[in-house]
């Protein structure tokens, strides 16, 4: 699993960049919704990622993620094979400004 963290100050185009990734995936025939990270607790956020992996998804898109959510995902990636996440799965996370 790979993590792409999109950072920046307010109004710097982070969400626009995430939407561009979504459109690029859509052009490839891959439909991926954008979830709003701040609406979920960190454990539930991790469960959302796990659910997507189990469903066979290859990408996860999230806007307005807390630094705790991003750290938790990075910790999951650091576990490597123990986390049982496919290396082809990519999480695109926009950090809250």
Task: Map each language-model feature to its residues.
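Conserved glycine(s) of the Walker
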Residues: 13-14
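Walker A (P-loop) ATP-phosphate-binding motif of ABC ATPase nucleotide-binding domains
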Residues: 3
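The conserved Walker
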Residues: 10
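Hydrophobic residues in beta-strands of the RecA-like P-loop NTPase core, especially within AAA+ ATPase
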Residues: 61-63
């Amino acid at each position: 699993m790979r993590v792409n963290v999109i950072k920046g100050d307010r109004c710097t185009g982070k969400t626009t960049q995430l939407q561009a990734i979504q459109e690029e995936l859509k052009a490839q025939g891959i439909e991926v919704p954008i979830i709003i990270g701040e609406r979920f607790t960190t454990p539930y956020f991790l469960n959302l990622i796990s659910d997507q992996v189990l469903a066979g998804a290859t990408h996860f898109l999230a806007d307005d993620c807390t630094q705790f959510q991003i750290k938790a995902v990075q910790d999951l990636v650091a576990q490597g094979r123990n986390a049982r996440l496919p290396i082809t799965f990519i999480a695109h996370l926009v950090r809250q400004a």
